[in-house]
Amino acid sequence: MDGEQLGMIGIAAGLFGLLVAFFLYNKVNSIKIENETVAKITGRIYDGAMAFLWAEYRLLSGFIVVVALALLLGGEENGLGFETMIAFIIGAICSVAAGFSGMRSATSANGRTAQAAADLSLIHI
């Protein structure tokens, strides 16, 4: 198996993983939170988490710009500065997307987990 085939397998596995994650996210989000207090708390946790991420990524964006420029200028000797900078920026964007989707999934699941446990009479809310 050559490198190109391995690359295609990696891409296919990544896309499959995204599909599974999307399916599970939608399955969890299909659970309705019936308790008004739990729904309100879940909403506030979500709002706080998103505010934190926006503040963090706003700060991080300056770091990303500085490192990207350092990669661009530092790689002029071997001619790989531009390519390395682009790879770094793509990685940073993917990291931000993973952070947002992970935080959104986690905060969304909190209240729904409590609701599902209550539906099974495991807890009283």
Name the predicted role of every residue range.
Residues 108-112, 116:
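Hydrophobic transmembrane alpha-helix segments characteristic of membrane transport
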Residues 2-98, 102-106:
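N-terminal alpha-helical transmembrane segments of multi-pass membrane transport
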Residues 33-36, 115-122:
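Juxtamembrane helix-boundary/capping and inter-helix hinge elements in multi-pass membrane proteins
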Residues 45, 123-125:
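Conserved small/polar residues in nucleotide/adenosyl-binding loops
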